[in-house]
UniProtKB/Swiss-Prot annotation:
PROSITE patterns, per database record: LCN_CSAB
Swiss-Prot/TrEMBL domain comment: Has the structural arrangement of an alpha-helix connected to antiparallel beta-sheets by disulfide bonds (CS-alpha/beta).
Species for this entry: Tityus pachyurus (Colombian scorpion)
Protein name as annotated: Putative beta-neurotoxin
Signal sequence residues: 1-7
MF terms in GO: sodium channel inhibitor activity; toxin activity
InterPro entries in the cross-refs: LCN-type_CS_alpha_beta_dom (IPR044062), Scorpion_toxin-like (IPR003614), Scorpion_toxin-like_sf (IPR036574), Scorpion_toxinL (IPR018218), Scorpion_toxinL/defensin (IPR002061)
Keyword annotations of the record: Disulfide bond, Ion channel impairing toxin, Neurotoxin, Secreted, Signal, Toxin, Voltage-gated sodium channel impairing toxin
Residue stretches making up the LCN-type CS-alpha/beta domain: 9-71
GO annotation, cellular component aspect: extracellular region
Keyword Secreted attributed: yes
Known tissue expression: Expressed by the venom gland.
Localisation: Secreted
Length: 72
């Protein structure tokens, strides 16, 4: 059985607490590796603060201002 995975979602990866995945003080390839681990195409450390990923599957939870629960 073949399985097709849609990968068209971009966004910030989230920690379990609802906060963006921090990349402060991490190695340069940290975000790209984390994004690829989540089946995304690529990613980078936005402003040295949080991991932003490209072309992730729709099932990956990403941070959203509307549903933000970080620090709450």
């Amino acid at each position: 059985i073949d399985m097709v995975v849609e990968c068209n979602k971009d966004g910030y990866l989230m920690e379990h607490d609802g906060c963006k995945l921090s990349c402060l003080m991490k190695k340069g390839t940290f975000c790209a590796e984390e994004c690829q681990r989540m089946k995304g195409k690529d990613g980078y450390c936005y402003a040295w603060l949080a991991c932003y990923c490209y072309n992730m599957p729709d099932w990956v939870k990403t941070w959203s201002r509307a549903t933000n629960r970080c620090g709450k």
